[in-house]
Amino acid sequence: IAQSLNRRFGTSFHAGNILMTVGAASGLNVILKTLLNPGEQVITFAPYFVEYGSYVRNYDGELVVVSPNTVDFQPNLVEFEEKINEKTKAIIINTPNNPTGVIYSEETLQKIAAILEKKQKEFGTSIVLLSDEPYRELAYGGVEVPFVTKYYHNAVVGYSYSKSLSVPGERIGYVVIPDEVDDSAALIGAATIANRVIGCVNAPSLVQKVIKYCIEHEVTVDLETYEKNRNLIYGALTEYGFTCAKPDGAFYLFVKSPVENEKEFCEVAKKHHVLVVPGSSFACPGYVRLAYCVSYEQIERSLPAFKKIAEEYGLCK
């Protein structure tokens, strides 16, 4: 894994920087268990994966949420800087993002890094940037996903093969703790112990062998299938009058609800046998998330229902 990352991103990782985990969820819990003291804070950007709050509370921490920037769903950096204080221990970012599919730009990561460097000096603390990257390989149209350790020395990466290999049930991933991270040797040692004490013990050894094979033979999901699905559903929904940002990655579409209460819209959609998740589940009310990680034919069959819903709300004639 270290060699593969070095080839792809020009890094200089070694085996000691990699800790195999039981998926990305386990990896995040391992790092938070390692970092957090009771009452310390972790900041994340809305919209965000709802389980982050539970992960932080597992270790008596507090999740602080930055309001969404609904213009382009890049992070709201003005509010972000305001929310950092002496209790801030870590920042969680997720790019490509669930639920928007947006990829944080290189400029965004550079600005986040500059803010964190400034705040570390201001408070005399160490703030870890924890990048949750289960969708890293799912980027479309030649868009690159910037690798966060290039921009900030105190960055830790969590990865899962659930999406890149379509094996979510196998629970296999890793965390990268670079040598450049503050007290990296202590952090790596503590994370190794945390992997055991939270009950994961170690990542499944048989699946680790499968991962080695997949890396050596460049096995991954068929991106063309996802991109084809994205183009179909995005094109149809925008044609019907819905508003949504075209995702550069992942396999979600984050759609603006035609009514203020998006849960009401979810119930209407359900009557047409369309299931969508309310944006309030991601701390971004007024939107809904749908997933296009299904067959192309299933999306085609759903389009008449989406059109009827649009007609009900007067979005199209």
PLM region spans:
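Class I S-adenosyl-L-methionine
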Residues: 2
